């Protein structure tokens, strides 16, 4: 509940074989796993689902029927309520990509949101993105986007990645209205 795992795989050997019209009997693929771990999250945060799908799933794990589940709901958006005190986290499917965002309740402290990485070296790029470098490739988190909905209008809030302490990252913000929720869309 406190981390994301990203798997990077180098498919260049397969691409080369395809280009050369060769069949590889035992292709060797190299992968790297990058872990993004959020620090200090609420271990008792309540899972929630939004935008329910019209279908459900059934899971049959082994022959022990006590481990089976049927009619499990599917959702277009899921998340945790109070992931941090006063902050909810959501994941959604956005055009075949998974996105996550935070909703900070009025008066809550977005500085609680902090994370570190294992398996990659992180660098904040001068243009505001966060670059994760591995031996086989990079992941680029574009500059974060933050806003507030006030009187039916979306008001932009300046937001940037910041290195809170060595290897620990978070967000910094420009001025915003503490009386309204703040949405952070990394």
Residue map of PLM features:
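Residues that cap or anchor secondary-structure elements
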Residues: 1-186
């Amino acid at each position: 509940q406190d981390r994301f795992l990203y798997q990077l795989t180098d498919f260049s050997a397969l691409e080369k074989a395809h280009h050369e019209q060769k069949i590889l009997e035992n292709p060797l693929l190299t992968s790297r796993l990058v872990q993004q771990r959020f620090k200090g999250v609420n271990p008792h945060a309540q899972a929630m689902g939004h935008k329910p799908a019209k279908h459900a799933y059934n899971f049959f794990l082994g022959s022990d029927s006590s481990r089976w589940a049927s009619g499990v709901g599917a959702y277009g958006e899921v998340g945790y309520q109070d992931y941090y005190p006063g902050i909810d986290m959501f994941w959604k499917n956005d055009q075949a990509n998974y996105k996550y965002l935070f909703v900070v309740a009025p008066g809550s402290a977005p500085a609680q949101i902090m994370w570190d990485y294992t398996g990659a070296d992180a660098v904040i790029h001068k243009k505001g993105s966060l670059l994760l470098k591995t031996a086989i490739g990079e992941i680029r988190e574009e500059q974060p986007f933050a806003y507030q909905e006030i009187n039916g209008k979306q008001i932009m809030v300046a937001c940037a990645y910041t290195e809170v302490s060595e290897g620990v990252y978070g967000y910094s913000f420009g001025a915003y209205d503490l009386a309204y929720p703040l949405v952070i869309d990394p």
